[in-house]
């Protein structure tokens, strides 16, 4: 029983860590470094470094 309660506690503790990662992405302007694009909430923009920039109208490249 103690083992089960410890497992449930660790699962609950893992959720705030994921939320804090989400917050850090939002603080950086919604940048997703693994695919070099911004998250959907940022709109149609792509990443350059740690900030998001508007897409060029004629090409899908960062300005």
Swiss-Prot record:
Disulfide bonds join 31-47, 38-52, 46-62. This is U2-agatoxin-Ao1v. Residues 15-28 form a propeptide. The keyword Secreted applies. Pfam families: Toxin_7 (PF05980). One of its GO terms (cellular component) is extracellular region. It is found in: Secreted. The keyword Oxidoreductase does not apply. GO terms for molecular function: toxin activity. Insect active toxin causing rapid but reversible paralysis in crickets. No activity shown in mammals. Does not show effect on mammalian voltage-gated calcium channels. The presence of a 'disulfide through disulfide knot' structurally defines this protein as a knottin. Expressed by the venom gland. Keywords: Disulfide bond, Knottin, Neurotoxin, Secreted, Signal, Toxin. Belongs to the neurotoxin 01 (U2-agtx) family. Residues 1-14 form the signal peptide.
């Amino acid at each position: 029983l103690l083992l089960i309660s410890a497992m449930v506690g660790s699962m609950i503790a893992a959720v705030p860590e994921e939320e804090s990662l989400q917050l850090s992405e939002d603080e950086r302007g919604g940048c997703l470094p693994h695919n070099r694009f911004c998250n959907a909430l940022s709109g149609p923009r792509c990443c350059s470094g740690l900030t998001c920039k508007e897409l060029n109208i004629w090409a899908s490249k960062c300005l």
